[in-house]
């Protein structure tokens, strides 16, 4: 008489530590403020006041703005990089890093008010994440761009305008928190850049998205940029999830 088949071995008890997926870290909130066209001085004063008043519980913020024409010179900037003193465009000395740059209509400016200590970010890491967000934003409009060692900002990677600067970046860190931020040239009058050595580089070409063939408007690019910035900050925001129409109109 054949013997009964052996009973199957009991399955090994699962390793509790290996079988329970860890909870993902909670995303830190980011408040997005759409400020429309705002004078530079007003934003500069407000950024410093916000940073001085914030507490460990203050949410990080991104301010999206378009400035009337203005040159800004970083705290270690050389005034000699302003080549035309009587250009009619005001010059504001500020406390960010970097040299001289130009802000004006048709350019997106995004200010990042971020608690680096709470996010456990080094300054270099934050700069890299901002640059990646800009590169991804431009790629969404079929524009290839790249960072350049030793020269913060984003530069055209190929074509007849290879090496031209399309986005600038400058930050200030106070009490472990950042302010100032970045600018992306969408569709603007580029002539004011001819009156300066952009970011301190003589002869550096500055370009905008429109000159490279991109037809997206300011608001569309700004929305794309904000979403990429938040993704790289590992944050979450109600404003970034709004429908397109609501996002365009959510100006504070």
Swiss-Prot record:
UniProt keyword annotations, A-Z: Acyltransferase, Cytoplasm, Transferase
Top-level taxon: Bacteria
Pathway involvement of the protein, from the record: Protein modification; protein lipoylation via endogenous pathway; protein N(6)-(lipoyl)lysine from octanoyl-[acyl-carrier-protein]: step 1/2
Chief location: cytoplasm
Sequence segments annotated as region (Disordered): 1-22
Gene3D superfamilies: Bira Bifunctional Protein, Domain 2
Pfam families cross-referenced by the UniProt entry: LplA-B_cat (PF21948)
An example Gene Ontology biological process: protein modification process
GO cellular component annotations of the record: cytoplasm
Domain BPL/LPL catalytic: start-end pairs: 56-237
Functional summary from the UniProt entry: Catalyzes the transfer of endogenously produced octanoic acid from octanoyl-acyl-carrier-protein onto the lipoyl domains of lipoate-dependent enzymes. Lipoyl-ACP can also act as a substrate although octanoyl-ACP is likely to be the physiological substrate.
Other remarks on this protein: In the reaction, the free carboxyl group of octanoic acid is attached via an amide linkage to the epsilon-amino group of a specific lysine residue of lipoyl domains of lipoate-dependent enzymes.
Protein name as annotated: Octanoyltransferase
Species of provenance: Burkholderia pseudomallei (strain 668)
Gene field: lipB
């Amino acid at each position: 008489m054949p013997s009964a088949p052996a009973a199957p071995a009991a399955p090994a008890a699962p390793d509790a530590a290996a079988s329970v997926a860890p909870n993902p870290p909670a995303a830190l909130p980011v408040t997005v403020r759409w400020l429309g066209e705002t004078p530079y001085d007003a934003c500069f004063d407000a950024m410093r006041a916000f940073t001085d008043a914030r507490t460990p519980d203050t949410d990080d913020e991104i301010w999206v703005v378009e400035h009337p024409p203005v040159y800004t010179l970083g705290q270690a900037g050389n005034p000699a990089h302003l080549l035309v003193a009587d250009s009619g465009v005001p010059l504001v000395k500020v406390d960010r890093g970097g040299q001289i740059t130009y802000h004006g209509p048709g350019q997106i400016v995004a200010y990042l008010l971020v608690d680096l200590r709470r996010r456990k970010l080094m300054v270099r890491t934050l700069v890299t994440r901002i640059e990646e967000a800009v590169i991804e934003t431009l790629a969404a409009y079929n524009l290839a761009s790249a960072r350049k060692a030793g020269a913060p900002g984003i530069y055209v990677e190929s074509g007849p305008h290879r090496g031209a600067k399309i986005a600038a970046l400058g930050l200030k860190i106070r009490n472990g928190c950042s302010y100032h931020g970045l600018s992306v040239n969408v569709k603007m009058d580029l002539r004011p850049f001819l009156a300066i050595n952009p970011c301190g580089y003589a002869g550096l070409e500055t370009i905008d998205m429109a000159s490279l063939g991109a037809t997206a408007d300011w608001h569309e690019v700004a929305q794309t940029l904000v979403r990429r910035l938040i993704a790289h900050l590992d944050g979450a925001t109600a404003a970034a999830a709004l429908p397109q129409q609501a996002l365009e109109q959510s100006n504070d």
